[in-house]
Amino acid sequence: MVQFENSVTVSGLLHFIKSDKKDGKFFPFSIRHENLWVDGTTRKDFLTVRAFVPEVKEQLRTLAEGTPIKVHGVLRASRGSGDMYLSAERLEVLNQ
């Protein structure tokens, strides 16, 4: 049988999303990425992340907007909308 893998590691700048879900089942946030685009311009991407793990949720509450972070997790799709997001299992603060 084939073994499938679903693991994602992304780093960037922490960006908080305005949401009333921060005290609920998950803590939503995003990772800001600035990448050189094919036409030479800078593309700003905001990668959607949800933290379900209690330790990660608590860690996020102590961090400031723009903190360099690395997130380890798995890619998921929302049951309702089908939107893709990274489900954060572990978070590291990167040295500036």
Model-inferred region functions:
Residues 1-96:
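Single-stranded nucleic acid-binding surfaces, predominantly the OB-fold ssDNA-binding core
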